[in-house]
């Protein structure tokens, strides 16, 4: 059986945490900041955790990452 391959697009977007969770960046941070408040922009800068319902699927894509 061939080796499992890591989904490279996902590997660039997610980072594993020490406790087995996954960190991600927020969407809506590329442009058009004039329509967002300072508070919104500040919160969008911080990393977020992947929701529980998505973790299993993403971990399968990142199977070979340590």
From Swiss-Prot:
Instruction: One GO cellular component term, please give it.
Output: cytosolic large ribosomal subunit
Task: Kindly state which keywords UniProt assigns to this record, in alphabetical order.
Answer: Ribonucleoprotein, Ribosomal protein
Annotated region (Disordered) at: 1-23
Q: Which domain of life is it from?
A: Bacteria
- Matching SUPFAM superfamilies: L35p-like
User: Which BP terms in the Gene Ontology apply to this protein?
Assistant: translation
The entry sums up its family as follows: Belongs to the bacterial ribosomal protein bL35 family.
In terms of HAMAP family, this protein maps to: Ribosomal_bL35 (MF_00514)
NCBIfam families given in the database record: rpmI_bact
Protein name, as recorded: Large ribosomal subunit protein bL35
Where does this protein come from, organism-wise? Answer: Lactobacillus helveticus (strain DPC 4571)
Q: What is the lineage of its organism?
A: Bacteria, Bacillati, Bacillota, Bacilli, Lactobacillales
**By which gene is this protein encoded?**
rpmI
């Amino acid at each position: 059986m061939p080796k499992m391959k890591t989904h490279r697009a996902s590997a660039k977007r997610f980072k594993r945490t020490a406790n087995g969770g996954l960190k991600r960046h927020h969407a809506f941070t590329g442009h058009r900041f004039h329509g967002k408040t300072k508070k919104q922009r500040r919160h969008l800068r911080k990393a977020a955790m992947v929701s529980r319902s998505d973790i299993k699927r993403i971990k399968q894509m990142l199977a070979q990452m340590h």
